[in-house]
Amino acid sequence: MSVLDEIIDGVRADLAERQAAVPLDKLKEQAAALPWPKDVVAALRAPGVQVIAEVKRSSPSKGALAAIADPAALARDYAAGGACMISVLTEQRRFAGSLADLAAVRAAVDTPLLRKDFVVSSYQLWEARVYGADAVLLIVAALSQDALVSLVERAESLGLTPLVEVHTEEEVERALDAGATVIGVNARDLKTLKVDRGTFARLAPLIPDDKIKIAESGVRGPHDLLAYASAGADAVLVGESLVIGRKPREAVADLVTAGAHPALRDRH
């Protein structure tokens, strides 16, 4: 069994517990009282290369990264540094995240939010709405094509922007067939956890220019952002290097400054 399969098994078990505790109708009732999600596509299409900063305590590849006792404070630092969107891990077992983290961040910032989890059910999309997300991660490798298409359509119907994650040529094709507008290329293979920063440069040419291309994993600083930019990235998602550093606001600001270089401003 791959690492991804193990994670999905845990996600399904935890999901079943939440579904038993909170009926779907209750989530729908709560969502109906909330404002419509923010326009994530517009934020990502702003001039230059945008920065998505992540609230991430742990990962399967590295284990514990940072305690992050106050995710709201970290999110405020990210927003002050200029992040165009904040990604919040909500998977419990391998990433030590929670929906409570998402709610805390939503209460702290006006920046668009991404719920980063292993979504396998439309119930999780309703959760994302209720807890304040504007976008949701959908991982192609974790879903059948029918499920992917269904979740993309349902997310959009709820006002959520699907960030559809790929790692191979076949997955790019599947993402496009599912109607994805925002496609994230993960340099990390979720089945082996190995990182290959060349993955983005290899797959980006397969993604049409009218789509938004996000480089995920492997961004250690401005030099990596610029490398991804040269390969066609519209945005980068950065987690580990921000949470293990001592100055997240400054680190985000450095990335944002690199992404705003005049040579990158007319890319959209």
From Swiss-Prot:
Its EC number is 4.1.1.48. Keywords: Amino-acid biosynthesis, Aromatic amino acid biosynthesis, Decarboxylase, Lyase, Tryptophan biosynthesis. The keyword Lyase applies. GO terms for molecular function: indole-3-glycerol-phosphate synthase activity; phosphoribosylanthranilate isomerase activity. The keyword Membrane does not apply. Pathway: Amino-acid biosynthesis; L-tryptophan biosynthesis; L-tryptophan from chorismate: step 4/5. InterPro entries: Aldolase_TIM (IPR013785), Indole-3-glycerol_P_synth (IPR045186), Indole-3-glycerol_P_synth_dom (IPR013798), Indole-3-GlycerolPSynthase_CS (IPR001468), RibuloseP-bd_barrel (IPR011060). It is an enzyme of class 4 (lyase). One of its GO terms (biological process) is L-tryptophan biosynthetic process. Pfam families: IGPS (PF00218). It catalyses: 1-(2-carboxyphenylamino)-1-deoxy-D-ribulose 5-phosphate + H(+) = (1S,2R)-1-C-(indol-3-yl)glycerol 3-phosphate + CO2 + H2O. Belongs to the TrpC family. This is Indole-3-glycerol phosphate synthase. It comes from Thermobifida fusca (strain YX).
